[in-house]
Structures are given as C-alpha cells and as structure tokens.
Amino acid sequence: MTTPPGTLPVDDSAVHTVREIAQQPALWREVDRIVGASREALDAFLDPLVARGDLRVVLTGAGTSAFAGQVLQPSLARHLGRRVDAVPTTDLVADPRGCLAEDLPTLLVSFARSGDSPESVAATALADQVLSEVHHLVITCNEQGRLAREHTRRPRSHVLLMPAASNDRGFAMTSSFTCMTLAALLALGKDARDGVAERLARAAESIIEDGAADRTAGALVDRAPERIVFLGSGPLKGLAEESALKVLELTGGTLMAVAESSLGFRHGPKAVLNERSVAVVYVSNDPYTRRYDHDIVAELRGNLPVGSVVAVSAESGAGTEGADAWPLPGLGDVEDAALALPAVVYAQLIALRASQARGLRPDNPFPSGEVNRVVQGVTLHSLND
C-alpha cells in the first residue's frame, strides 16, 4: 500500500474507490460551475413550474440515488415552500398508481449514476402514463445512459449532466451521490447557492488530505465491530441510510449496518446493539433538532464501551462530550442537506477500511456477481396487462 502526498492510502483492490472518494471536492467545484453555466436554461425550465401553486415535486432514484432524494426533501420543501416528496423508483415502478395517486402537475427529479438501471427509465415512463402533466429534471452522471438519451431535447424535460468523472467506476456510488445531491440543491434551492460549494469542498479537503479522518476511520474498524449504527435527523437521516448502505455494499454484507433517526432508534431498532457495536451520530446544525442528536449521543455513551460512539458535527463543545468528535470544519451555519456532503466522506472511509479489513476488494466486493454495479435481473411489467 502506498500513500501519495495529499491523498488517501491506496492499493490495487481499491484504485477506483479511493480516487472517487478523494476527487469529490474538485468535482463539487465543477458541479458549481456546471449549474452556474446552465442557470439561464435551468431557470427558464424551473421557474414557471415552481411558480405554480399546485405543483408537486417528486425526488426519485434507486438505492443511493433514492437517498439523495431523502437528504434533499426537507431542505427543498423549505426552499420552495411547497410539497416535496422523496419516492424511490423501486416504489414508483411497483405501485405507480399509489405513489402518484393525486393527478397533480408534477416535477419528477430523477437521480441516476448510469441511467441504465431498469427502474430509472421505467419510472419516468410510468409517470408520463399515470399523470396528466409531468415535467422531468434528470440529474445523471452518464451522458450515454438510456435515461439521459431518452430525455435530451424532450419539450418537458431538462437533463443536467454531472462531471464525467462522477460516473464512478468503483462498485459503490461515492462521488456520483454527492455531485447529484449538490447539483439539485444548487438548481432548486436558490437560497443555498452563494459560495456553498466552495465551503463544502474546503471542508472535505481538510477531512481527506490531512489523513486524520482515514486514521480515525481505521481505528474504528480496528475495534472489529459486529454491528454499526448510523443515526441522523431530518436530511441527516437520509445520510444515515446512505452511510449504512455503503458499509453493507463494500463489506459484502458481512458487517451489519443499521440506519435510523435519532428519535426513531429507541422504537425497536435499538435492539441491534450489543457489546461489539459502534454508533455514528450525525449532529444537525439546526439548534432545535440537534438537541435530540445530543440526547442519543449521551444515551449511547451509557450503552456502549468507550470509543464506540462517534459524533460527526460542525459544532464544538457541549452536547458531544464522551463521544469521539469527528469535525466538519467551518460549516456551523450551513443547512443539513449541504452538511451531508462532507459528512458522508467519513462513512465512505469507514466502509472502505472495513472492506479491506475483511480481505475484500472495495472496487468489486462481489466478484461472483451476487450484487451488480448496475442492477440486473429486473423484469418490467406492463401497467395495463
């Protein structure tokens, strides 16, 4: 294993995954430029829709792409002052009449790394079939993907392409997730535009480049946990879901990973804890919400051995005593949907190191093909049969 200056340690089992984690700050700056250059066309497409009082916004994707919607939903609902729902494509395809029961004018925001997953195109087609009026904002990392090709130059569609490098070659979505999430926040959350991408990039660079985060993630993995719990509130619950999925994917399902909200964890999911568990709590920047995050940190301190509870936080001081504090420097005033982007780097590093500790190859933890980078094996059925 080598350690090039200013980067993460890398070996041939994780060439793509390491590069794709490390490239995120640079790609976020590129996303900011892309959205800025597309601003006139984006506003021409979005502003008349958002001005309509009856518009419903639906954020959709599968797996990690669905969690992008979950991170964004509370924030965009506030920014837009209207109903915003996060509905996975996997739900929408299985039950389109239920997910789209109200025949309202709808903006369907589709997130897709490749755009070639069976549900990606099917979800947009079913929305067209079920609803009287639907408009599509497609945010994807693959210009050649079927989703991008089918919606390019359609009159009610706008395709926003991410940097080519964000079409992750590693098994797990890393830079694709953060780039698409940032792009949607910049495109739709107008109050979040000014300078936020640069601030997030600088924070992530400080996490990645000094090596401390990688060492602390490695130290957590060295505890040989049997179970890992990720908790967060509001947008950070979506981040907790994405974090747990990263660990499950890169460890080939050998490390049990659970996600919940800080309040919801007590209502049954807390049963997962044993003496070989570790917990990561994402602490909200909202002064009201983070009280609940502080409460669960304090409770977990009493349940788990010293060193087993991590608080990922932009704040310093009260509320996280007794927990290992993993910082998000200079971001104490940003909204939680934006905070999620540098915060997820910690989960990506945990997943990477846990995978390697198990002798797996993070770039392909399922060499026999039990789980695929682009989902296979889905049979799509006609709605009218």
From Swiss-Prot:
Gene3D superfamilies: Glucose-6-phosphate isomerase like protein, domain 1
GO MF annotation, one: carbohydrate derivative binding
UniProt entry keywords in alphabetical sequence: Carbohydrate metabolism, Hydrolase, Repeat
Domain named SIS: residues: 46-206, 217-365
Metal-binding as UniProt keyword: no
Tree of life domain: Bacteria
Catalytic activity: D-galactosamine 6-phosphate + H2O = D-tagatopyranose 1-phosphate + NH4(+)
EC numbers for this chain: 3.5.99.-
BP GO annotations: carbohydrate derivative metabolic process; phosphoenolpyruvate-dependent sugar phosphotransferase system
GO CC list: plasma membrane
One Pfam family from the record: SIS
InterPro entries: GatZ_KbaZ_carbometab, GlmS/AgaS_SIS, SIS_AgaS, SIS_dom, SIS_dom_sf, Sugar_isomerase_AgaS
Family: Belongs to the SIS family. AgaS subfamily.
General function of this protein: Catalyzes the isomerization-deamination of galactosamine 6-phosphate to form tagatofuranose 6-phosphate and ammonium ion.
Protein name per Swiss-Prot or TrEMBL: Putative D-galactosamine-6-phosphate deaminase AgaS
Species of the source: Streptomyces coelicolor (strain ATCC BAA-471 / A3(2) / M145)
The organism's taxonomic lineage, starting at the top: Bacteria, Bacillati, Actinomycetota, Actinomycetes, Kitasatosporales
